Amino acid sequence: MAEDLAKQLAGYKAQLQQVESALTANGENEDLLKLKKDLQEVIELTKDLLSSQPSETADDACDDMSASGSQSWKVGEKCMAVWSDDGQWYEAEIEEIDEENGTAAITFAGYGNAEVTSLLNLRPVEEGRKAKEDSGNLPMSKKEMIAAQREYKKKKALKKAQRIKELEQEREDQKVKWQQFNNKAYSKNKKGQVKRSIFASPESVTGKVGVGTCGIADKPMTQYQDTSKYNVRHLMPQ
């Protein structure tokens, strides 16, 4: 996971350099500016995901050890679970269990809210109700706190990964638009080119019609003598 993220980060940085290079020639292009902003955001998100990898890996071993001694739960079983929004205990039903990650997908009874939580955050209904009546909430053990923190990090990482996915899709859309723009511009320029003859009329009043060298290759153009020094009177009889 970390290795893949590192490769993606290097790719994003290389793309950002290309965009910044293009902006030096076209600094007001809205598509390029949007692309630069998206790349900067996805780079920061990827860095955050990379920095969270070691702590999550370290927590895995702790959670696996804790889950092995926890109660065995079944799909469809009623339980008491902590709702992540307020940290309070509510009655819920187990919809799915992920033994590998030590988590369960639950739905809170009467509310319909669903979320994924650690198996360590579940309690039998009677035990949970009694504890809730006695203290209003169950104190979390150190292992439970670690599990809760890990769940928070997981959810945060999932949100970041989803945002990265959205930004990548936006970049793909921008890339297609940019390619279409370049193709259209190239086609327009190519179509507008006119092959001019060297004998075409000059575009300005001071222009001269060119004299070709067809048939006399490697020879200089014809030189004309300046006749301005001759006066008409020289041609008149004395």
Swiss-Prot record:
Q: Which InterPro entries match?
A: SMN_Tudor, Tudor
Q: Name one Pfam family in it.
A: SMN_Tudor
Give GO BP annotations, semicolon-separated: mRNA processing; RNA splicing
Question: What assembly does the database describe for this protein?
Answer: Associates with spliceosomes.
Q: Where is this motif: Nuclear localization signal?
A: 142-160
This molecule's function is given as:
Involved in spliceosome assembly.
Localization recorded for this chain is: Nucleus speckle; Nucleus, Cajal body
The UniProt comment on domains reads: The Tudor domain mediates association with dimethylarginines, which are common in snRNP proteins.
Top-rank taxon, per record:
Eukaryota
What PANTHER family does this protein's entry cite? SURVIVAL OF MOTOR NEURON-RELATED-SPLICING FACTOR 30, SURVIVAL OF MOTOR NEURON-RELATED-SPLICING FACTOR 30-RELATED
What protein name is recorded for this chain?
Survival of motor neuron-related-splicing factor 30
Q: Name one GO molecular function term.
A: RNA binding
Q: Which gene encodes it?
A: smndc1
Q: What is the annotated signal peptide range for this record? A: none
CC per GO annotation: Cajal body; cytoplasm; nuclear speck; spliceosomal complex
Q: Where does the Tudor domain lie? A: 72-132
Family, according to the entry, reads as follows:
Belongs to the SMN family.
Primary location recorded for the protein, binned into one broad class: nucleus
**Keywords, in A-Z order:** mRNA processing, mRNA splicing, Nucleus, Spliceosome
